[in-house]
């Protein structure tokens, strides 16, 4: 809908499905790096969004998403632990572009994310296992350098981006037989950089590709590389 000040407000919904599958290695049966088991987790999501855009290109983007979790974890000795639960995620993001050169703008961005995870208690055949997690808050400050060109009559948008992420202190707890408790702290600071391109093939069809690298800049040791490519349809 069009607002009195010329801004545009859009609302909608989306659905999603995610699947995680991996191996667990560690200090097991007296050996370091020995295979301990496998984990699988699937999530089905339903979300709502609202986006306010300014004629000059500024935006405010809000998202609420609810995810149903279903997991299957099993050890090399045949013990199993089914994981069921849900996740509530809320996000608000704002940005505003400033021209810096012909065909190029720089867009400072800020974002805050709230997330609450709830998992059902389970029994793995040896002990009762319960889960408890604090609400997690994550903040992001970043910037995107974006260009706009025309190739073969079609818009082409290359971009560079950089972000600083900080997850404020939160704790996950796993309790075995109502007595033994393992805690995991969430607090961390991470930086990432990325490059990407978007090519419009038609008013409602575009293709995109991106690559990102992220690394913790605190005492936590974590590094990751990501790549994405796809086709986007709008209607």
Question: Where are the language model's segments positioned?
Answer:
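Membrane translocator/pore-forming domains, dominated by Gram-negative outer-membrane beta-barrels
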Residues: 1-235
